[in-house]
Amino acid sequence: MAEPRTASPRRLPALRRPGFLPPLLPPPPPPLLLLLLLLPLPAPSLGLGHSAELAFSVEPNDDIANPGQPIVLGCKVEGTPPVQVSWRKNGAELPEGTHTTLLANGSLLIHHFRLEQGGSPSDEGDYECVAQNRFGLLVSRKARLQAATMSDFHVHPQAVTGEEGGVARFQCQIHGLPKPLITWEKNRVPIDTDDERYTLLPKGVLQITGLRAEDSGIFHCVASNIASVRVSHGARLTVSGSGSGTYKEPTILVGPENLTLTVHQTAVLECVATGNPRPIVSWSRLDGRPIGVEGIQVLGTGNLIISDVTVQHSGVYVCAANRPGTRVRRTAQGRLVVQAPAEFVQHPQSISRPAGTTAMFTCQAQGEPPPHVTWLKNGQVLGAGGHVRLKNNNSTLSISGVGPEDEAIYQCVAENIAGSSQASARLTVLWAEGLPGPPRNVRAVSVSSTEVRVSWSEPLAHTKEIIGYVLHIRKAADSPKLEYQEAVSKSTFQHLVRDLEPSTAYSFYIKAYTPRGASLASVPTLASTLGEAPVPPPLSVRLLGSSSLQLLWKPWPRLAQHNGGFKLFYRPVSATSFTGPILLPGTVSSYNLSQLDPSTVYEVKLLAYNQHGDGNATVRFVSLKGASERTALTPPCDCRKEDVTNHTSTTGIVIGIHIGVTCIIFCVLFLLFGQRGRVLLCKDVENQLSPPQGPRSQRDPGILALNGLSRGEGGQLSRDEKPVDAKELEQLFPTAGSAAQPGSTPTDPAAPAPCEETQLSMVQLQGFNLVAGRTTEATSPCAGPGPVPAPQDIGPVPLSEGQTQPPAVAAPQ
């Protein structure tokens, strides 16, 4: 167990090297000063400052306190009196009471810092100083007040055994607020900080180089801050005999850790190396940039110290341990990230603008990481909307059509993880003489569910210079930031506002504009659009399985505001009644139908409803055959040998192949040589030359939705099909002309086409295998006698080596 101990008044060193000053525990405040702080002073209201602009000359800072300790959060304001100062805690107004006192200069005194107990709230939190005068309101940066704490050790030092001349390292870790100061004791006595062999690092590390026998002992880690003092468990150091005669490769025992610091802090990159002979430790940056010399120091035998770090010090640092006189080296690396709090490169400037014009503030801040910029108007967060625009990552604030309601103090607040900063500016709206008054008699009348007609009368005075009107529109339930505008001609005194939402209340007001500025706004008027039943919702279908499907649509959350939702119906097309309605809320976007008949076509209806009734339905016809049937398309020419009795014999297979090839040749020759039409073909071949009538499930395995895209009852072709045309085939096969060659003898159109040996080439067309052929001198025994016209010269038939006949082509199965 860690042993609690009363804090000693001695100084506690952090870095034991020349050039490093040991930090001190904060001394108690002088009694006289403490007495003055505790004296209550009257609340400030007058004469805080005489600068024209309201601004903070002192802002509160973060602080850490012990319970019972008095705390003062500083705040000083300059500006045109009278100035009222108040405080906020965690965003809420902090009431005055006996526990806190507002001092004359605007600072806040907390008499006795307390934690939450017995129903009393804790004083921990974020505090803001608020200043206000007749020009506006200003809020300071946030100051965080925390209680001092000290945890138990979560890493205690461990026993170490080393050789004479070697290196020993102890480490302890503990958390606390403020960060604990770590010191070390040997055998209950503070270690000798004058011994250069002892190196103390502020993160709780003790390094001992050049070990000697007298270094043996028990070491303790001592952590202290304003909250407490704690002592770790003891760890024994045992130093054995010298091993200087044994060669050892250089080894890095501990390399640098990844560090994240804030600018102006001190970075300690540790590197402990051993070996025999003792290795030489050096440092470099991974990106090749020089480390530099200003603020750089090596502590002990290889620890790199960077004082007053900047963002430029960020990078990866490499520790190298080299064996003297050789290139043998070991390396370790760690990343240093330096963060910088937000600070302003460009402050917003106070401006004056005529009424009705545009005011613009620019605020640019830098920091690491890049800060986020927020705008405040009189202490309240200002968002984009209406006539307020934020551009360039919130660095530019634009206010169009400024009016008296826009006069305020605007603050730019830049904040990142390292800190925050604020700057302010004031907007003054100028009113020119002779501006028209506000438009009069503004009325709004509902015309339909999406339209409202707004009418008005021109102002009483100064109407000759009016160049137009601007109508401001927003939902009555929305913030003024969400309003939008529509411009109207100067000769028009009514305007039809379109594209509104049904059954919704809207607010309207209007301004008159002249070259010198805008008038005051008219009195706002309200009107509600008429109600109507919802429009049909878009509906799509997705297949889930052979007997289930999913219906999809877009949710309409607005339906819930008008006592509405969706109604779903479905039925087989052969049924007389629907299943349903299935009532669904407006936030639902899908519904699954299951246990359906795969062989049945279903009719599905979806409609939206509200307090005005049911809207029109969206209807879909859905078939599940695409999921239940995965069969190939029927071949276009399905000529079969009717008298084949043994389908499994080799002879039957060969005969079937020849018959199939012959029928395909007949089909192609008939299509290629149109003059040979009126060929007597078997009825099966003629039927198969027609476009297929069944659903093309093989091309589209999804749902077949029968919504005017599929084939009708009359046998018309679907959208993606077309009949086979002889002219189209001539374009596809230009070498196979339809006219007879010179010298050929015309054949009897009633005579059957000869069946000849061919060499085939397959071309895919509309789901059919079309065959283009070349005739040879030999005739097929299946055709009658008759001359065959020679085809166009398309060259000799190529034969492979050792081949005497054209290769056989497998018939489609």
From Swiss-Prot:
Pfam families: fn3, I-set, Ig_3. Keywords: Disulfide bond, Glycoprotein, Immunoglobulin domain, Membrane, Repeat, Signal, Transmembrane, Transmembrane helix. Residues 9-19 have a biased composition (Low complexity). Residues 49-151, 151-232, 250-333, 341-428 form the Ig-like C2-type domain. One of its GO terms (biological process) is neuromuscular process controlling balance. InterPro entries: FN3_dom (IPR003961), FN3_sf (IPR036116), Ig-like_dom (IPR007110), Ig-like_dom_sf (IPR036179), Ig-like_fold (IPR013783), Ig_I-set (IPR013098), Ig_sub (IPR003599), Ig_sub2 (IPR003598). Residues 1-21, 689-724, 775-813 are annotated as: Disordered. The keyword Lipid biosynthesis does not apply. Glycans are attached at residues 105, 258, 393-394, 592, 616, 646. The keyword Thylakoid does not apply. Detected in cerebellum, kidney, heart, lung, skeletal muscle and spleen. GO terms for cellular component: membrane. It is a single-pass membrane protein. Disulfide bonds join 75-129, 172-221, 271-319, 363-412. Its main location: membrane. Residues 438-532, 535-630 form the Fibronectin type-III domain. The chain crosses the membrane at residues 653-673. It is found in: Membrane. Residues 1-47 form the signal peptide. Belongs to the immunoglobulin superfamily. DCC family. This is Immunoglobulin superfamily DCC subclass member 3.
